Amino acid sequence: TLLASSAASDVYKRQLRSNDAYTPGGKAGFRPDRAVTVYSQILKRLYPHVPVVIGGIEASLRRLTHYDYWSDALKPSILAESGADLLIYGMGERVVQQVARAMRNGYNAKLLRKIRQVAFLSDESYVARLDPAATIRLRSYEECLTDKTAFGENFTVIETQSNLMEPTATLVEAVGDRCVVVTPANTTLTTEELDHSFDLPYERAPHPRYAGKGDIPAWEMIRHSVNIHRGCFGGCSFCTISAHQGKFINSRSERSILAEVEHVVKSPGFKGYLSDVGAPSANMYRMGGRDRELC
């Protein structure tokens, strides 16, 4: 998910958009609000015994208590409402492989809960067995509903942990009679790992099922662009890029970038120029702190 479903539908003062840049023909109304929750609930209803793993920006940014602008209310973790079994947060290439290996012989909660950068619901007895020195108990969802400072305290802890290069703390937040457990994030991918992800043979095109249904505006804007790094150290209060991708810059190699440029140049409809060579926000290619040990 590139954009949260509610944000794709919403404009100023909670009015519905008349168009949607992510659908063929730019037409609005083809995606439900809170799509991850809606689709997860459908899957669990149709296939109750099949584990559902959610990820992407909509799930990632709702892994704990969060403010929902559309309803003007605090919402619990998306795990509590969606019924999903596991949540992968942040950029998940490394994690999704670990999850796939752990589930090779079926759903194994014990193995999955040992993986970094995931979230899941548990009972209090599981939390009691966690190492107290490596566990941070957040204020509960119910406390956040009645006390604004509780929600603020939680955010401070979450933001502090997301700013660490190598976080070690497991976060726990009570929701009703259960707990949301968030394992610490992985370090950023190495350049080699990031290159491998970008070097996969992507089609760089909309799904064939959309053929003949009109141009997809968002696709037309980025079809001849190249992403050269991840992360943003800006930390702007209005933006969630650093919360999802992290504040440490993760750059591709020049070889990988140039290989993609050659592929784009040879693609159908190329107009003779690259529309953008950049990253999520600004060009921070290979930027970083002088003393990484302090991070």
Residue ranges of each PLM-predicted region?
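Single conserved hydrophobic/aromatic residue that forms the stacking wall/gate
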Residues: T1-A8, Y12
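Well-ordered, non-membrane alpha-helical segments in soluble/globular domains
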Residues: G29-S40, Y69-D72
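Surface-exposed amphipathic alpha-helices with a cationic face
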Residues: Y39-Y47, V265
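Short beta-strand/loop segments at the ligand-binding rim of alpha/beta enzyme cores
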Residues: Y47-I57, L61
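Structural recognition of alpha->loop->beta junctions
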Residues: D72-M91
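Two-component system phosphotransfer/interaction surface
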Residues: M91-N105, T191-F198, E262
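Non-catalytic, alpha-helical, charged scaffold/linker segments
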Residues: A109-V172
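Radical SAM [4Fe-4S] cluster-binding motif and immediate context
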Residues: D147, E153-H196, L200-C295
